[in-house]
Amino acid sequence: MTAILIALMIFSGCKTNEDTKSKKAEEFANLFFEQVKVLQKTDNRIFNLEELNDNADDEAKKTVKKYYDDMREYISEEQLIKYLNDQELLSTKYYESNVTDYKIENFKAVPSDKKEGAIDATFDVTFINDSKAEIAKKSYKIRCMFDGDKMVDAFGEMFPPTEISQNK
């Protein structure tokens, strides 16, 4: 039974069509921003969810590692920004009422050097008011873990906003 599940995980991890890429980027962004909402309610503390089971057998670990290697192509800045815009996940309902727009900068997603098989992403979000002035910046870090082709965990860190002084 385990061999069948592993074979299915390997097969599903090999799909590289555009729908699959979009779905993976969407899963990544959705889980991350759900986490951001939790972090906002916990005074920006690091919030950890249950980690991937460390007792997986060697074959399963190889499968997961291969999948992580494949995931690098799924997590791109363009896909994340498109998903954020589609879902309005950085709209004013999550932040101060004077925020009317945002921009994402310094996006980077790489295989984690701290956790085998994980992907780490970092980026900054600058918040803009209705006068088109940049009023605050927040930096984000996230680590995502997968089991086969399904994201099973994510945890992150949100740093407090940095006010941007206005030149008058």
What does each model-found stretch correspond to?
Residues 10-13:
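C-terminal motif of bacterial Sec signal peptides marking the signal peptidase cleavage site
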Residues 1-4:
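Sec-dependent signal peptide recognition
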Residues 110-168:
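Exposed beta-sheet edge and beta->alpha loop/turn motif
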Residues 92-112:
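A short, amphipathic edge element
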